[in-house]
Amino acid sequence: MLSSSPSAAAPGIGGYQPQRGAAVFTAAQWAELEQQALIYKYLVAGVPVPGDLLLPIRPHSSAAATYSFANPAAAPFYHHHHHPSLSYYAYYGKKLDPEPWRCRRTDGKKWRCSKEAHPDSKYCERHMHRGRNRSRKPVESKTAAPAPQSQPQLSNVTTATHDTDAPLPSLTVGAKTHGLSLGGAGSSQFHVDAPSYGSKYSLGAKADVGELSFFSGASGNTRGFTIDSPTDSSWHSLPSSVPPYPMSKPRDSGLLPGAYSYSHLEPSQELGQVTIASLSQEQERRSFGGGAGGMLGNVKHENQPLRPFFDEWPGRRDSWSEMDEERSNQTSFSTTQLSISIPMPRCD
């Protein structure tokens, strides 16, 4: 009976009706032939064959009756009755998801998320980004506000006190002089007063005098360290307790060439044994080009007494006026003033 099915199926499918009263196919054979004919139509049309047509036909127990062309209604209508887990992939060793619209997040056992999956994902909105660290918030880049440019107008911010026990710093900013002054009574004061040395030496100007002074008070309460430019004539920034002294160039000394020394004349028992020499012109170009920090890094401390230079100081202050006249003849530059005073512990 099975061997004659291919030859008899062609006339039946093509429209040929066999003689009535003869049982040609069973219900299972007829359903399988219809399925194969439908697959053939998909192949001829060039359309992908649906997966349901590729599933094997499992006959129902009630469909055991023989199909007869004489009484087609006698046989029940055949349906594909499949268990949800029994599918094409289960037949070939793989399991097809019976609920593809459902989120696939499971605990590995029986529980499964009941929400619908996202159209572009296998998971719902809650479980789409479960693998990522959701506790970490996105970092927003904060743009720093640009620093305001210095204005030519005079702006002074001063906070000072004259209490010797608890000195407070003071900050002073001038119009053409951009200065930083931190100091108070009873504290050491560091003062740097110089124009833009980098621009000066880049233009080929020559430094006439490299000035470096160190003042040491008898009481030890106030100490000043000052660096002044050749074009600056403002000596008011020196500590009030330290009087200015004339300048003289030593004849024969072990210091660097072009070096000048200043000192506060003290009693012999209070005289410090520290000598600070300025740098040469070539060293000044490198140090002043890099800023005041480079100048301080190259200061040479020598353990030589200052007594041999005391006798060489001028007895009068006329040299100061001559120095001011020489500076007035030179080209004036905008002065940049930096004054820092650091509290020093009192030495008994």
From Swiss-Prot:
<dbReference type="Pfam" id="PF08880">
    <property type="entry name" value="QLQ"/>
</dbReference>
<dbReference type="GO" id="GO:0006355">
    <property type="term" value="P:regulation of DNA-templated transcription"/>
</dbReference>
<feature type="domain" description="WRC">
    <location>
        <begin position="97"/>
        <end position="141"/>
    </location>
</feature>
<feature type="region of interest" description="Disordered">
    <location>
        <begin position="306"/>
        <end position="348"/>
    </location>
</feature>
<feature type="short sequence motif" description="Bipartite nuclear localization signal">
    <location>
        <begin position="130"/>
        <end position="137"/>
    </location>
</feature>
<feature type="compositionally biased region" description="Polar residues">
    <location>
        <begin position="329"/>
        <end position="340"/>
    </location>
</feature>
<dbReference type="Pfam" id="PF08879">
    <property type="entry name" value="WRC"/>
</dbReference>
<feature type="compositionally biased region" description="Basic residues">
    <location>
        <begin position="127"/>
        <end position="136"/>
    </location>
</feature>
<protein>
    <recommendedName>
        <fullName>Growth-regulating factor 5</fullName>
    </recommendedName>
</protein>
<keyword id="KW-0539">Nucleus</keyword>
<feature type="compositionally biased region" description="Polar residues">
    <location>
        <begin position="148"/>
        <end position="161"/>
    </location>
</feature>
<dbReference type="InterPro" id="IPR031137">
    <property type="entry name" value="GRF"/>
</dbReference>
<feature type="compositionally biased region" description="Basic and acidic residues">
    <location>
        <begin position="306"/>
        <end position="320"/>
    </location>
</feature>
<dbReference type="InterPro" id="IPR014977">
    <property type="entry name" value="WRC_dom"/>
</dbReference>
<comment type="function">
    <text>Transcription activator that plays a regulatory role in gibberellin-induced stem elongation.</text>
</comment>
<dbReference type="GO" id="GO:0032502">
    <property type="term" value="P:developmental process"/>
</dbReference>
<dbReference type="InterPro" id="IPR014978">
    <property type="entry name" value="Gln-Leu-Gln_QLQ"/>
</dbReference>
<dbReference type="GO" id="GO:0006351">
    <property type="term" value="P:DNA-templated transcription"/>
</dbReference>
<feature type="domain" description="QLQ">
    <location>
        <begin position="24"/>
        <end position="59"/>
    </location>
</feature>
<keyword id="KW-0804">Transcription</keyword>
<dbReference type="GO" id="GO:0005524">
    <property type="term" value="F:ATP binding"/>
</dbReference>
<feature type="region of interest" description="Disordered">
    <location>
        <begin position="125"/>
        <end position="165"/>
    </location>
</feature>
<comment type="similarity">
    <text>Belongs to the GRF family.</text>
</comment>
<feature type="short sequence motif" description="Bipartite nuclear localization signal">
    <location>
        <begin position="94"/>
        <end position="112"/>
    </location>
</feature>
<keyword id="KW-0805">Transcription regulation</keyword>
<dbReference type="GO" id="GO:0005634">
    <property type="term" value="C:nucleus"/>
</dbReference>
<keyword id="KW-0010">Activator</keyword>
